[in-house]
Structures are given as C-alpha cells and as structure tokens.
Amino acid sequence: MKKIVTILVTFLFVVHTHAQRQDTVPDMTRDGATLNEVVIMGNNSRKDMLMKSSQSLVRIDKSEIVSSLSGSLMQSLSSIPGVKAINIGSSQSKPAIRGLGFNRMAVTENGIKHEGQQWGEEHGLEIDQFAVDCVEIIKGPAALLYGSDAIGGVINLYSDIPPAKPFEGKTELFMRSVNESLGLSVRVAGKNNWFYYKANLTLVDYADYKVPTDSIQYYSYYIRLKEQRLRNTAGKERDGSLLCGYAGERFSTSFRISDTYVRSGFFANAHGLEVRLSDIDYDRSRCDIDLPRHDVNHLKVTNHSAWRTGAVRWESNLSYQNNLRREHSEPVSHGYMPMPPGTLERKYIKNTYTASLGMKALIAERHSLNAGLNVEHQHNRRSGWGFIIPDFETTSWGGYAFDRYFLSDDLILNAGIRINRVVTRIHSYHDWYKTPVAGSDSVYRERSARLRRSFNSFTWSLGVNYSAGAWIWKANIGKSFRVPIPKELGADGVNYHIFRYEKGEAGLSPEESYQFDAGIYWHNEALDIRLDSYVNYFPNYIYLNPTSAYTEGLQTYYYTQSRVIRYGVEADIRYRFLRRLEAVVKGEYLYAEQLSGNKKGYTLPFSPPWSADVELKYTFGSGEDGETGFISAAYRTVGNQHEIVPPEKSTAGYSILNLSAGKVFAWKEGRLRLNLQALNLLGKKYYDHTSYYRQIDVPEPGRNFSLLIGFDF
C-alpha cells in the first residue's frame, strides 16, 4: 500500500511539472463535475452542466429549494426522480438515491463528507437547509472520487458561495400547519475587496404532528390518538454558521464553523415503556418534549482553499466534526437487565478528522486530469445503559486519478481509478449487569469482542459523453465499494426504536457494486426530455436478515450478505407552451432481487415503489422589475408495493394533490418573497412504504399548509 501511495504522489508531481510548461491557462469548462467552478466561472448552460459528468447529474439552485420547502432538506428535494426522503416524522428525514440510503450514499458540504451517525434510522441529517445555496446530486456509484459510502450516489451541498454585494442579507419566516411549526432564518453577508463573510441563524419549533386517523395498530395493540396527533413528536432545532473567506485572482480560502442542534421526541406509544405504565401525561400538551427523546448536536469546522501554480489548479480541504447524540428513555428492566439508574439510554460521541488534496490540469489541450489524495479518521465512544454498537476507530486513506479526454467539444471519454485502505478497530464491551450462564455463576456477558479489520479496494470507471444538436447521450460503467460499518460488524443488542434484536457479523466482506448507467437528453425552446436508466449488480450486498429466533424476547435479525441485482429508470419531461405555461411529467421505477442466500427471490428491505408526478405550472410577471410569480398544481401517484421482505408489510398505492404558489415583490432596494404550499390538499390517508413509522401503521400527514415569507436586502 505504501508503494502505491508513493507512486500516486510521484504521479501528481510529474503532472504538475508537465502542466507548468504549458503557456495557456486551462479551459475551466474542461474540468470535472465541480459545482464551485460552475458558479464562479458563470458556466451555467444546460449543455455544459450535462457534459461535466458521464453520470446522471442534477443541479438545484436556492430558488427551487425555497419553492418546494418542506420540514427538512431531503423532503424539499424528494420531488427529483431517483431521490427519496426516508421520513422520520414530519420534520426529519434521511436521504436515499435510487433506493440506497444510510451508509450507501454520501452527503458532502462544500466538498467535505458529512459524518454523523448515518446508520441510525431514527434521526435526520444534521444540516441547516436555509444555509444551503445550491445542491448538486450525482445519481449512481461515486466511490471513485468520494470513497466508501458513495456506492449509491452523492448529494453535494454548497453553502460557501461568495456574496455579490458589500452588504446583503435575507430574513425568512416560515410556518407549517401539520405540526404547528414556526421558524425564523436570518442571513447577513458581504464582501470588501477580496474578503467576504456570511452568517446564518435558524430557529425552528414544532408540536406533535397530525395524521389522518384516530388510532393505529402497533403489533396486536390498538392505540387511540388524541386529536389525531402522534404523542411526543414535538421538537426544536437551533442552527448557526459563520463563514469568512478570501477570494483572490490566484488564491482563495474560506473558513466555516457551523453548529446544528436538534431535540425531538420519539412517538411515546412505540418506544420504551408503555404509555399506560408511564407517569408522564403525554396528552397534557402537544408542545412538550418528554421522554423518550433524543438530543443531537453537530459541530463542524472546515477550511477550503484553492490556488494555481502555473497551469495547475490545486484544492485542499481540512475539517473537524463532532457529533454528539444522546437518547433518553424512562428506565425499565428488560430480560436480565435490572432497572437502570437513570434516563440516559445511549450516548454517542463521534469525532471525525478529514484532510484532502486535489489537483486539476489540462494536458496537451485535450486531457483534463483530476487527481488527489485524502485521509479520514473517525473516533466513536458510547455510554448509557443500552447497547447496540461498540466503541470504534476507523482510519481510511486513498488516492484517485480521473481523466477526461476531449476528442472534440461534443465527444468526451472519461476514465478513472481509485485505491483505498480502511482500518477499523472495534473495542470489547461487557454488560453492566450479570446474566446467568448454565453450569456456572452469573457473568458480565461480552456483547462485542475486540476486533481489527483491514480492507483494501481498487475501483474504476469508464464513461462517455456525446452531444449532437439538441441531443446529449451519456454512458458510464464502473465498480464501487463500501466497507462494512462497525454496526454491521459488531452490533449485539436490542434496538428499542423498532423492537428487534440486532446481531453483527465480524467476518463480513467489503460490499462491491458493478453498475452501468445510460442517459438520453433532448432540448429545444419548448421541450426538455431527460431519461436515465441503470443496472446494478452486487456480488455481496450487506443487509439485516430477519430470523424466526428470539433473543431476550425479541425477534433476532443478523447481518449477512447475498448477491443482488437492481435496475431502474427515471424520466423528467418538461413542455412549455402558451408562453407562460409549463407541463411537467416525472417518474421513476426500481426493481431489486436477491439472487442468493436465505431470502433468494425476495426484493431488498424497504424498496421504494414506482411513482409518477404530473404538474402544471403558470408563471407571471415580466421579471424586469424583479417581480415574478407562479402557480402550480401537482398530482402524485405512487404504486403498490407488494414485493417485500418479511416482516415488512405490503403498502397500497395512493394519489395526492399538491398546490403551490409564489410571488416576488420589489420593495425599495429589496425583494419581498411569498411562497404558499398546500400538500395533500384532499386529506388522503396513505402510507409511505419507506417511512420510519410504516411498520406500526402510522399514515403520512394529512392536509398540510405551509407559508414562507422572505425579505432579501
């Protein structure tokens, strides 16, 4: 491995020396898919964006995020074909791309991978959606550039774009009816010559959210809901960030510090002590955050720098992240565990240190080379009376080289390789209470044994982009990988969130994926057509397999591997007519099947069903004075999902109607913005197959109105 790293470093030096001999500065449009350059260089044309990558690439700007603003960032982006929000109540969610979520996709912020407790099903993404300037989504394997976890795709978030004025800002007030949420977000920013700054503050409070039912069934129990609200799902969010930067002609750098804090309750009837046995009066107030609850705080300190030496553009990233997560529940004895001494069920402290160095250069005017090295170290410690994952450290380092060969401006070939090494160290853990053992005295049972695993990987990618008139074709084939996470290797305990016993497997192999993507795009002044398809093969997909056995009174699940095939298609068609009307048809379909193992012939757990959206949008206002507006109606249809992995439940399809409208008013030197949404206007009762609460028959929110009032100055 040391020899390979030495070769990569030497390779970077040789390329740097060769590129410096060129007399011309490389054309930035021939760089790889890096959104910072798209914004800075003003290269925003549709063709240039589509030609930047041979994979499916979608870009969403700030105005699009605001127009579909929802309770969380991923809910705001979930209308994009292939992108899904795994909802955890009404104000938190996790992202998924083409059915792959958690540790099978990466979220980056300003080029740095966000590291929280991604494995957890019960908490969302710790990022302030109001601080995000724009989003770039790569659908399909991206481990070549981003390393392990990017096997399903990447969501790149950008919040470091320099302001355009000496002083500017915005204030946004937003409300949602489904959980009576009320929030305020304020931004101030400015620049002085080469220096700039940006500060954000967001405050959100919300109550227990409403669902269109009076009762739900949890296993064999029927639970009545007061005023159709899920008890103890209220919460609050406090976010803040400060960015300071310098943007010179040949050197730029920015420092950013952000902190996100969330406190929210878990649905009291489906976690921990039964409500009827609790002393807490959950129906006293719909705004209280009682037990059980969790507190999550994510601190992030980052630096991004870019500079030129000759014809080579260098980039570096440095970051420190601290993720603190605490779960509190009413103490209750279970199995051989006596009554715990306090309410702290679980506590996780995760520190992540990241460093990367990359370069881009144009060689012989036809090769756009992108290469780099990166290293990451994670340090995780746990405490509390509940156990699910052990203490661990993970260190990873790797290098990549990616070349884009321009046969012409309309025909580009892509090829890349990456090497990686990951070392995971898992600590031993023994119960804090004794368990009787046959033939001997009681012992402090060892839940997790000391373990050290090393993983090496080699990944590659080949692609092509071709443009002819109004047509653009893309194709990409490659191999990706994902290292087993400590939960998959060392879990051994009760997951109280969904009442099951989870058991890890220390001998799991790294997950590999072979995928072929193809896309066809056509565009003229009236019509946009976008079709993407993919085939994905896993020789050793890792998943949590349910068994008929029971441990400590709960059904036992264990991690195992099997061969899996996945394929799907996504479509986005937009037609503009009568000057101000636009019709949009979007849809997606995914098929997955296990080809080996105990669940051979089954799909994968929680696979999303097919879906289709039809939208009609009317825009008004000339835009010359800054005053524009829109009105839209969208009809969403989701198919049945009967392809399940027991004990999953089949989910019936549904159709819902959504309305939205927005208007921008010029006011003095600023702009006043209004956005109104009416989601599920007809109050349809339906279930989301991938929702966190689906297994206990909790329907999705009913009729939901939201209002955003913003002022830009």
Question: Which sequence ranges carry the predicted segments?
Answer:
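Short acidic/polar hinge/loop motifs at secondary-structure boundaries
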Residues: 113-139
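Transmembrane beta-barrel wall of Gram-negative outer-membrane proteins
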Residues: 179-205, 218-267, 297-299, 306-309, ...
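C-terminal beta-signal and adjacent terminal beta-strands/loops
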Residues: 206-212, 537-540, 583, 637-642, ...
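Outer membrane beta-barrel strand-and-loop segments of large Gram-negative receptors
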Residues: 232, 342-358, 503-510, 515-516, ...
